[in-house]
Amino acid sequence: MAHKKGTGSTRNGRDSNAKRLGVKCFGGELVHPGYILVRQRGTKFHPGVNVRRGGDDTLFAVATGIVTFERYGKWRKKVSVYPVEAAAQ
C-alpha cells in the first residue's frame, strides 16, 4: 500500500475548435459569384441553380442573384441562386 498520494492522471481534457459551419447567406439575400452560401459536412444542402459544391462540401454562388432554399425530393433541400432579372419578373 502506498504511503504517498501520487499525482494520478487523466485521459480527458481536450476539445476541438469550433468549425463555424452553417448557412452564411440566407434566403432572399443578393449574392455575387464566389459568395459562400453554406459551410457544411456532407450534403445537408444540395447545390441547385447557379450553385456549385467545393471539395469540403461548401456551397458557393457562381452567378449574381437572389438566394433561395427549396425542397428537393421528399427529404432533401437545395440552395439555388436565381438571377436578379428573373427574380424581378
Curated annotation (Swiss-Prot):
GO CC annotations on file: cytosolic large ribosomal subunit
Lineage top rank: taxon: Bacteria
Record keyword rRNA-binding present: no
GO molecular function: structural constituent of ribosome
Keyword Ribosomal protein found: yes
Keyword annotations: Ribonucleoprotein, Ribosomal protein
Biological process according to GO: translation
HAMAP family cross-referenced by the UniProt entry: Ribosomal_bL27 (MF_00539)
UniProt similarity note: Belongs to the bacterial ribosomal protein bL27 family.
Protein's name according to its UniProt entry: Large ribosomal subunit protein bL27
Annotated organism of origin: Synechococcus sp. (strain JA-3-3Ab)
Lineage of the species this protein comes from: Bacteria, Bacillati, Cyanobacteriota, Cyanophyceae, Synechococcales
Gene coding for it: rpmA
